Structures are given as structure tokens and as C-alpha cells.
Amino acid sequence: MKILRKNHPLLKIVNHSFIDLPTPSSISSWWNFGSLLGVCLMIQILTGLFLAMHYTSDTTTAFSSVAHICRDVNYGWLIRYLHANGASMFFICLFIHVGRGIYYGSYVLSETWNIGIILFLTTMATAFVGYVLPWGQMSFWGATVITNLLSAIPYIGSTLVEWIWGGFSVDKATLTRFFAFHFILPFIITALVLVHLLFLHETGSNNPSGLNSDSDKIPFHPYYTIKDLLGILLLLLALMILALFFPDILGDPDNFTPANPLNTPAHIKPEWYFLFAYAILRSIPNKLGGVLALILSILILATFPLLNTSKQHGLIFRPITQTIYWTFIANLLVLTWIGGQPVEYPFTTIGQIASITYFTIIIILMPVSNTIENNIIKL
């Protein structure tokens, strides 16, 4: 009797992707975050779908509809807090996933890496438009400030901003289209995830040693399905602790006040996962320069395959680059902290130093350390 999963046209694809997939036997828990991101995406789509059933994308009722979800809908408060804190868990997993890719040299699989960058940007866009939907003070002013950055584009900037707003300010038309974008983008992300996996399975997974693992592969199921299951349980535990015990810890108190175009909050800031890019944006006095730096802070990830000159794969046997890598992580944490601080001395100066360091490490220090380590190997 033929095995169904190996012969059925549809099940065969699933089998080659998740069951009989040859996987390096040495991959560590840092490789769990890909599957955790998949789980986060499913949680976000499901909770988002239930929220969309009760939400109204109208400036007069949006804030009230979110309050209604929390007060009157069965377990509405739980669905809302799972969705809001699920976004934070999503970005934590995303940052670790990208960090692991840099540390272990996964960027040499350039197609997978580039699709990953597109996924990162799409996820950031989804989170941004989602943050506008509750129509609180920070939602409104965050949308106004960030969309207004496009006015820095020469010639077409002002027209472009008004086109995105659907008027002369952030208003009903803006909220309606942002809701439409927030609904459709997760499905685009899902399609991109499939392309990401397709490219990954063309080459096979990387592994911690950075060596060729063709001679040492094991089937994905049951070894890594069980391992992923443990990761998923820990993720759900962390999400539940966050949603049930500290639901508002990562939110902004200003967002409990309905949007008021006549009253600007003292400190306009985005969600915590955008603060590093926001700090880079604010550290440049010129508006257009700030916007370019903001975009480059993400797109610079695409330079990793191009600037990599190392004869070794990953950083596991490269102490100099390891030191630079962990300096880079510390620098990112500093940027995140600065992004949440007011625009005053000494925070502006620290932000400028951290922003320069961010780009210097990637463009100059890492390639230089690659060359030094290559020369050390020759000795």
C-alpha cells in the first residue's frame, strides 16, 4: 500500500516541507524562532479576525468600539490583549530570528534573506497601521507624524501625503484605508512566508557550525516537531503571562484618551519595537536625511551578503566579529531606550552617537574584522 503523505499531490508538499524534510542534526534552539513566528502570525490573524467582527473604522465610533470589545464582548478583553501583546511577541521573535541569521551567517542564502527583509518591512507596515486603529491620542498623532515624513520627498511629497490621508489631515478616510491595509497585509505576509520557506528548502537550513551538513541530516518529524512544540508552549506561556498579568505594560497611557487633533501629547512615540528606527530618524536634524536614515536602518540588512568577505561561515569561530556583533546588539538596545526619551540633552547626543555607531558597525567594522580574521587564518 502506498503511503498517502508521499503520494497525494497536496500532502506531498506538506510532507516535503514539514515531515520528511532533511534537517541538519545540530541546529540549536535559536532555529525555533522561525516556527514561533508562524505561530505568532496565526494567533494575530485569528485574534484580529474576531476583533474585526466588532470594530468600526469610523473616527466617531472607533475608540468606543474598542472599549465595547473590552467591556461587552465575551472574552473581548482577552482577544484584544492577546492581539496587542501578540504583536510584541511577534517582534521579539522577529528580532531574535534576524539576529540569529546575522550571527550564524544565514544571509549567504541571499534569496531567503532578501524575502525575509521584505517580510520584516511588511510586518512593520502592518503593525504601524494597526496601531492607528484604536484611535487614541498616540494612534492619531503617531499616524500624523509618521505619514507626514513623506512630505520630505522633493516635488511630490505634499501631494503624496494628502493622497495617503485622503484629505488635508488624518481623518475618517485615513482610518478606513488603514483598517483595510491592516486586514489585507497579514495575508500578504502569509504568502511571502510560503515564498520564504520555498527558497529555504531549495538550499536547506544553515547550522550553528557553519559547515556543510549534507552528510548529517535527520527528518524534521519527529525530532524538530517536538522541539518546536516546546518552543510554542513557552511562547504561549510568555504571551499569556503578558496578556493576563501585565496587559498594558507595553502600551502608551496616552492611547487611553480618545484622539484629539487640537491637543498634542507631550512626547509622541511609536510602539517599543519601532523605537530604534525612530531614534535614528530623530538623530538627524534634516527631515529628508532623517527619513532616508530611517529607511536605510532596515534596508542595510540587505548589505550583509554583499559585504561578507569572511572565509568562515557564521561567527562561532570568529571572536573579533563576535565582539563587534554583541556591541551592535547593545547599541540597538541603547537606540530603543533613546527612542522613548524626550528630545533634549543628553538624549539627543547619545542618540546621534548610537545612530552613527549602528551604521559604522555594519558598513565598516564588520567587513574590516572579516579581513583581519581572514589574514589571521593565513598565519
Swiss-Prot record:
Name the PROSITE patterns on file.
CYTB_CTER, CYTB_NTER
Needed cofactors: heme b
- State the Gene Ontology terms under molecular function: metal ion binding; ubiquinol-cytochrome-c reductase activity
Q: Where are the transmembrane segments?
A: 33-53, 77-98, 113-133, 178-198, 226-246, 288-308, 320-340, 347-367
* A Gene Ontology term for the protein's cellular component: respiratory chain complex III
Cofactor remark: Binds 2 heme b groups non-covalently.
Among InterPro entries, the record links this protein to: Cyt_b/b6_C, Cyt_b/b6_C_sf, Cyt_b/b6_N, Cytb/b6-like_sf, Cytochrome_b, Cytochrome_b_C_euk/bac, Cytochrome_b_N_euk/bac, Di-haem_cyt_TM
Subcellular location(s) per record: Mitochondrion inner membrane
Q: Which GO terms describe its biological process?
A: mitochondrial electron transport, ubiquinol to cytochrome c
Q: What topology does it adopt in the membrane?
A: Multi-pass membrane protein
**What family is reported?**
Belongs to the cytochrome b family.
List the protein's name.
Cytochrome b
Tell me which species this is from: Akodon albiventer
